[in-house]
Regions:
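Carboxylate-rich, polar loop motifs that coordinate divalent cations or form catalytic acidic clusters
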Residues: 1-249
Length: 249
């Protein structure tokens, strides 16, 4: 939110704010079911704050809720049946902004793209686009790994790569690019890039560091059931898993 405050998304408790100096936690955005224009859900999968200080919330399972801090008002974005100019699915798991200021949403039925300049929507990898050949349409994480190159991961063994210019889709499964007998992941829960340009991918069986240019893949043994990846500094990464939190040097 700023240098002193962080927003924390919860599953059932809405959004809380923590002061990084005092560690004081206070409710920030909580459902108000008695108001027609209040917050409408407490299960928040992801948070994004834009340049206008609007808070975009992946409000599971009812779409996107946008809170405007300047006017304390809310706006709702939902899927409209048969309308291609809408969010592809209301069950949103992740939100990112790319280098050009446009937004991408990972959902339980494909990926939605929102052009912030024109207000136009596009979607890929959903059940409505059978020509793209993917059998799984649930995506849990999304990341811009290079300018205009988007990776999306979910309930599949690898990542789908989307070229923003052409909206063409390709598939990348790391074990195929190594000479090891590492088994493919059951799912990809988080994809991140670090300061050096490496791509980090965390799944059910392993943590991987990928060089996009050379397609070299390094596996980190002993780390599995990955849920979150955050870069601490140039030499270390925080790795969250189903069993705890690790600091990787």
């Amino acid at each position: 939110l700023n240098d002193k405050e962080l927003l924390i998304a919860t599953d059932g408790g809405g959004v809380h704010k923590i002061n990084v100096d005092t560690y004081q936690i206070t409710p920030e955005i909580v459902a108000d079911y008695n108001s027609n224009n209040g917050m409408n859900g407490n299960s928040i999968n992801d948070i994004f704050v834009d340049d206008e200080e609007r808070v975009w919330l992946a409000n599971y399972p009812i779409g996107i809720t946008i809170q405007n801090n300047r006017y304390t008002s809310y706006k709702w974005i939902k899927h409209s049946i048969g309308n291609k100019q809408s969010l592809i699915n209301d069950q949103v798991n992740a939100i990112i902004e790319d280098r050009e200021g446009d937004l991408w949403f990972a959902t339980n039925n494909g990926i939605s793209f929102f052009n912030s300049k024109t207000g136009q929507w596009r979607s890929v990898l959903s059940a409505f686009e059978e020509s793209q050949g993917n059998k799984s349409h649930i995506f849990l994480t999304i990341c811009e790994v290079a300018p205009g190159i988007i990776w999306a991961g979910g309930y599949s063994s690898g990542a789908y790569q989307i070229d923003k210019k052409t909206f063409s889709v390709s598939y990348f499964m790391p074990p195929l690019y190594t000479h090891t007998n590492k088994r493919p992941d059951k799912y990809i829960r988080d994809i991140r890039t670090d300061m050096q340009g490496y791509i980090w991918s965390g799944g059910f069986y392993n943590l991987k560091r990928i060089n996009l240019k050379t397609q070299e893949v390094r596996f980190y043994d002993g780390l599995n059931s990955i849920t979150a990846i955050v870069e601490k500094d140039e030499k270390s990464m925080w790795i969250g898993s189903a069993t705890g939190l690790c600091l990787l040097d």
